[in-house]
Amino acid sequence: MKPYPFSAIVGHDRLRLALLLCAVRPEIGGALIRGEKGTAKSTAVRGLAALLSVATGSTETGLVELPLGATEDRVVGSLDLQRVMRDGEHAFSPGLLARAHGGVLYVDEVNLLHDHLVDILLDAAAMGRVHVERDGISHSHEARFVLIGTMNPEEGELRPQLLDRFGLTVDVQASRDIDVRVQVIRRRMAYEADPDAFVARYADADAELAHRIAAARATVDDVVLGDNELRRIAALCAAFDVDGMRADLVVARTAAAHAAWRGVRTVEEQDIRAAAELALPHRRRRDPFDDHGIDRDQLDEALALASVDPEPEPDPPGGGQSANEPASQPNSRSKSTEPGAPSSMGDDPPRPASPRLRSSPRPSAPPSKIFRTRALRVPGVGTGAPGRRSRARNASGSVVAAAEVSDPDAHGLHLFATLLAAGERAFGAGPLRPWPDDVRRAIREGREGNLVIFVVDASGSMAARDRMAAVSGATLSLLRDAYQRRDKVAVITFRQHEATLLLSPTSSAHIAGRRLARFSTGGKTPLAEGLLAARALIIREKVRDRARRPLVVVLTDGRATAGPDPLGRSRTAAAGLVAEGAAAVVVDCETSYVRLGLAAQLARQLGAPVVRLEQLHADYLVHAVRGVA
């Protein structure tokens, strides 16, 4: 079936513009599209690939999709097994990056892709080449492609270190306008009823877009980006307080691409504005609880400030310019194929400080107190070591060594080491024929994350609201750190006769803030149900990611009162958590004068430390969780 025409997409003007600008100038660094399900993200990317094939006049140019389960050797390439086994030759087999050369590399749900693969993709997109040093191979080849990633923020954030590497970002959502939604339905149903007729109806519009892409690609290097425009871009990025210089370069390249797309040869303010709206939103976000996007009023103010000429420096004492000094020449416009590059290698003269924007009001704070936490540090390297900043032996990381078949740390076949062993045994004897003794397995290292599950007593036996305020603050604080890594946090509450999954495992602070804003309290204490729900969640998440280590934080007084034999069932449920290998922390919420010590008994059954209710400040709880990690 032919792809849905790009020109037939209803609305999403900013999304379409971002994709077109990336097609005009791939050096921008690609685009990240964030949005809820069913917002034409994938449809737009496939339509762009079809346009690019026409614009470049290449039948080989097209769309290459990178599946989430792809391995590093499939992405960058590896040993050509067929030629090695048949001819005994040491040959390279290209990967997906080589196939994407000249076209579009599309990664759906890029936030769920392994971090080291995202690093490889972004490096290749920025450099335009792939360097392979693995399996005894040293190889380099061109890989110039338009990198497009899509993601649903509800499924977790992309680490800021990786987010900054994408040139442009666009947030999309379905229109709430009834007429627009009706038009979307009509066009989609017409396409599904007769794809060929529908594509033919928009063929002329798509052909015009392809022609504009080709024309812009041919002229973008000739677009003039003058000194005044460069100063305006630099002042704009400084005003928004972005880190590093990547934002300045991306805005400059995008502004030039936008000017070429409009068919003009000089970058103007409207080009800089369009570029800033696409290149700055994800770079100015400093906190996981900040809103996405960029404030138009702030952008207008920044552009206005950037347009003001700096005040001239006062003449030095003793007079002005001497008679024999040449008169200063006005700034001249010059072509630049690398916008934002310095004009000289010498020391820059002192310049007035860039104006800062007035602070915009922050959105209302999430429930409870949010605070900064220390990063999780786990000493040593070994199986199960948690934390995305901690190296750990696992079955899905990068290959770091080879081992004998009997090594328990090895996972899967290490192809090159196996062939090397066979070659050493039968050197010069023709085609390789590995024997069982030649087989080597791969030792992999990756970065593992935690799954922190808060199991909270929301019954009416004591101050449930105070407990939830503390757990809300601790959860959001852990998510602040999870924003830097890929830790996940979940919250289970139990009251009356059941347990409720209040917050599904997430690393999205936005989702957590909304879900933790409301909760119900009161009723009996079904402790066993809460522990059983935590175990069920751990089992379910292990199917998705076996490397993620579960940590359970139980906030209760231990006074189970719901159901038959509540204390006995609680002990059985605790034993089930231990059997799943979950580490735990118990927060003793008992406040009565006569203490029964039931929470301490539960802690002994879980093999967990105990934190007193009097110590239940959110930052203390966070440090307790990190202590058992």
Swiss-Prot record:
Pfam families: AAA_5, AAA_lid_2, VWA_2. Keywords: Acetylation. InterPro entries: AAA+_ATPase (IPR003593), ATPase_dyneun-rel_AAA (IPR011704), BchD/ChlD_VWA (IPR041702), ChlI/MoxR_AAA_lid (IPR041628), Mg-chelatase_DI-like (IPR052989), P-loop_NTPase (IPR027417), VWF_A (IPR002035), vWFA_dom_sf (IPR036465). PROSITE patterns: VWFA. The modification N-acetylmethionine is found at residue 1. The keyword 4Fe-4S does not apply. GO terms for molecular function: ATP binding; ATP hydrolysis activity. This is Uncharacterized protein Rv2850c. It comes from Mycobacterium tuberculosis (strain ATCC 25618 / H37Rv).
